[in-house]
Amino acid sequence: MKIGILTQHFLLNYGGIIQNFALQQVLLKLGHDSLTFEHDTCYSRTRWFLRTIKHILRTRSFRNLPVYPIYKGRIGNKNFIKFVLRNIRSVPVKDFVPSLTAQYGIDAYVVGSDQVWRPAFNLGPRLGNMFLDFADDKVKKLSYAASFGCKKWEYTKEQEKACSKLARRFDAISVREASAVDLCKNHFGIDATLVLDPTLLLNKEDYEKVCNNIPKKENHIFVYSLVVGESVMNVASKVSEAKGLPIVVKEAGGKVKKEDTIEDWFAEFRDAEYVVTDSFHGMVFSIIFNKPFSIVMNPSGGNDRYISLLSQLGLTECIVDEKLTPSSAIIDWEQVCSRLNVLRESSLLFLKQNLR
């Protein structure tokens, strides 16, 4: 089948790129041809500002403000762009219209993974696009590991009504977090299937192939953080002191350095002695590479995506406590991998059954 993918694909976001890469690789292994549709328009600053003011007036709160979009002229370092061009088939799309299906010969659309159904990350018409509002009833529609970003319902009544109607047109819906199963049931009236993030459908060897040209690094403590702050570095310093190893830090988003590469990021997990992270995909790759790790939770919330996976794999001991004590859990990786393989098979089965 020819499959069109819609996802959150930020070129300054390691996780955003890698989950898209992984999904395309998995679909290829299943015998499908896939293409990621990239939003090519910039949501105007004026509309973003007005939307933000409207949100504050309506909720009387500064929580869950619309996220300012990444503009085309500001995205990515060149190495990230090179990785995307080499490894991810994508096409820029200015407007999502019904003619896209015939234009690219699409047999099915897959929405996911990552926070594709979080309103703050999908301004203007994008939220409707993420529910395939432009696709007619003839084309197959499903979501794979879609995420709302948190367990709290963030949709307005208007958004809920519109998206609920669109969601019912899907042939199958799968989500990334256990809480998202409840949100789909309670707000859309739909039964959703819990599946793994697409990065977990590939194994360690798949990622080692990507970074096999990166020389092996000396043992170190690897810190991967969305925003490197006092809490993360406090934990990392304690681990570093206990193990007598240096700390290597990589930061997401706007803090990505021009020399950083996706391949080197994989190699950091490959060669690290221990990982400290506050990132979902930082946690995921610690698991993939069987590295002991500590996950520092966000005090402002949105942690269900971490807890959901850790609970499934029996790894909740890796969560850092309020005293910022690093996890010293002795992980039974054989048991973790066994559980992961079961979840991987059921997740792949979802794709196999619904893409035929």
Q: Which functions belong to the PLM regions below?
A:
Residues M1-R356:
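Active-site anion-handling motifs in enzyme catalytic cores
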